Structure formats: structure tokens, C-alpha cells
Amino acid sequence: MYDIIIIGAGVSGCACARELSRYDAKILVVEKEEDVCCGTSKANSAIVHAGYDAAHGSLMAKLNVEGSRRMPALAKELDFAYDRCGSLVVCLSDEDRPALQKLYENGIVNGVEGLRIIERDELVEMEPNISDAAVAALWAPTGGIVCPFGLTFALAENAAKNGVQFRFDTKVTGLHPLDGGGAGWAVETDHGTLETRCIVNAAGVYADTLHNMADAAHPMTITARRGDYFLLDHTAGQHVRHTVFQLPGKYGKGVLVTPTVHGNLLVGPTAIDVDDKEATATTAAGLDEVREKSGLAVKDIPLRQAITSFAGLRAHEARHDFFIGEIAPGFVDCAAIESPGLSSAPAIGAMVADIVRGSLHLHNKPDFDPTRKGILDPKALDLAARAELIRQNPAYGQIICRCESVTEGEIIDAIRRTPGARSLDGVKRRTRAGMGRCQAGFCSPRVMEILARELGVPQSEITKSGGASKIIVGTNKDSL
């Protein structure tokens, strides 16, 4: 029997796993997809929100501010890309100044540090491409940007380093208290039944399904809210220096324009409620909306330099707040984690771990190691150090992805980690091989060769993203 089973290997589930790995417990993370970071955590705005938007007194506000405060130290401990570049909420007319002032005041009572309202002259100095209609902005120096993949992988790897197990391609189909009156739960999956003393429900847009299995008397409904984005080439990455928001509305924080930690420009999202919780296809209408609304706050966005578009789903619940707590003995919800869930993840993990520790009376693990070293990036080295690295390991001299200058050595490292890459997308999210201008058109065959060699399988078994997404369907001779 496990002490804890965490359902869901997104950023919230992995944050919970990492924090719970501090304790002497047998922990398993169960994920229905083929890898970590395959749901909301892979398709979002990559923003660390300062915390001025969430309603004062809400759990969302508390954990957003705390998560943002924790992020710089966590980035150093776990070696992932993070930049506290600051954010701006742009006011486009004098009529909107009261709303901007209200946002400022909400941020102050939420405990956000350094907030101030700046006028147009200072705004233009900070952002030369700001809209001609902009009259003022809320400046939040504690806002930042992060690599959502890097953060999630770092949490997962550190959890695994401290003994947490991961089981992928395993879908939870049911759960119920153990028979005989004993404490614990049976977790039914498509690969058999597991037993545990405690469940942490971090299942993203499907967290309501698990919640309702555990507590049918108090049902929850999570709506999938889809957002479309454009990702622009590195050549557009300096169009803005900070994350630029418009004043938030009923459906969220609006269309933003932001640099990314890897030098791209990200524009989006929309906010459309959908019935299908797998509906991650972009729409023409959604992308048209991004084009139209992004230009309200930032002028001359070079959208012709877009290299891809994508859509992600947020887990929206009617109360518009995180839902975290023990709803039944040994069943802890970590549900309704929509924006600012990524920003809040470090604090969410700590809160859930504290609940579980108290419920199970866990003890600290004396040999817990809070550190993790990320994948070595030869581009970050000076020429002498890079030459020495290649001398010691020639794989770092073999460029596989030309767009992002990713080497064979980095890809091998990504595959050999725990949990490691098993698909093209797994390699892409860990190393950026395939994330550049050609969108894997050049490097995919080489990455497939390396995956097949490292995993000991034929290339015909390599997938883009697990499941039935195989790249090779047969040989030329088979089709004759």
C-alpha cells in the first residue's frame, strides 16, 4: 500500500509531490498521459503573476502572492529558467483610471510589494512600443516569466530524487474507501487497482470527476476554458521588455503580450468555455481575436513572425477560487487550479503537503535533498568551457536542432533523466529541440534516432506525444 497517491503530473501535482517528498512516506504520482506536463501546464501564458488581481481574502490571492515570493529561491534550488522582469497593466483611457486604481488598491491589501501607478511618459520609456492610446499603467516589479515545462520537470525530478515514483499512461477510472472500515482508498486504473492511505486530487480539468467520486453529496463542476495563443520567433522577442496586460475582465486577465525566458514573444490568450475537456485545437475566430485585441495595448506587433499557434485549457470553477482541502478522510482536493495556478504552484505544494502531513502524521526525511541540476546548456558557456565540454563528451559538439542550437548531449541527458523523455514532445519540452522556426521540420528524424537508440526500441515505436501518435506507420516496402 502507498501512503500517498497523487493523481495528475501537472505543475500542481508535481509541486505537491516535491513538497511531500520531504517526509518519510511511500508516494506515487499517477498520470494518464505519457509524461509530466501534458495538460494545462504545457499550454499557458508562462507568467508569474504578482498577485494584484485575485480577490482579496481568497485562497487564490494568498497563494499567488506567496508562490510569487517563493519562485526566485526555488528557481535557484531547482535550476529552471525564471526572470522577474515585472509586469504592466495598461489603462487605455482616462475613463478606466478608477478601475486601474481599484486594481492597485487590491494588490496593496493582497500584500504585493512595489506596486505603483505610472503615467504615460514613464510608460513609454519602459515600453517604447506601447499603444498610442495608453494613458497610464500599473507597474508590478514582482511579476515575472518562467518556463512552465522547466518548472514542472524540475519539481518532478527533485521529487523522484527523493523517492517519489511516477506511473504514466495510467488513467484513474474509479475510487472508493477501502472495505472493512480500514483507513485508506482503492484507486481503480486501467492497469489495475492501487491502494493508498491518502489521495491528492490534482487532476486539472478532470479534478471535478474525482472530487465527485469521493464526495457526491457536495458536487463540483469544472469548466474547461480554452485560450488561443501565437508564439513569435526570437526576432520578435524584444518587442516588449515586460509582460503587458490589459485591464482584466469577466473572463480573466485579457490578451497579454510578453517576452518568454527563451527569447520569443508570446501573444494571447482568448477565454472561451468549451464542453470538450480535450478541445485544444486553435480556432480561426480565436486567433483573429488575439490579433485584434493584442494591438490595443501594444502597437506594431510583428505577427507575421509567428512560428506556431496553440491552445490550452484552464480548469475554471464557478466560485473562481482554488479549492484545496481534505474533503473526506484521506482525500485531499487540489482542484479548480486556473490562472494564477502556475504562479501559485510552490505555495500550493506547500499547503497540500501541510494538510497531508497533519492527516497522516508524517515525519521529516533526514536525507531530503532540495536541489536539482538542470540540463546543461552549452550555449551558456564561454568558448573555452564549451570546447572542454566537447572534448570530454563529443555529443555536445553535435548540433541536432539548428533553430535552437540543441546538441545531442542535451537530448541524451533529457532521455536518461527520471522521469525522462520518451517521445518527440518530451524531448522538445525538456531541450527545445523542435521549438524553433522550422517547428521540428529539420531535427525530428535525428531526435527519433536518438530516442530509439537510448530507449532500445525501433523507430517505428517512437511517438510524437505517446499513445497512437506514432511517426512511422510502416516501411516503403510494406506499401508495395
Task: Locate the predicted segments by residue.
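Iron-sulfur (Fe-S) cluster-binding segments and ferredoxin-like electron-carrier domains
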Residues: 278, 407-417, 441-459
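Helical element adjacent to the flavin cofactor pocket in flavoenzyme catalytic cores
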Residues: 138-198
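Short beta-strand to alpha-helix junction loop
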Residues: 55, 62-65, 90-99, 138-157, ...
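C-terminal catalytic lobe of FAD-dependent flavoproteins
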Residues: 252, 261-262, 273, 277-399, ...
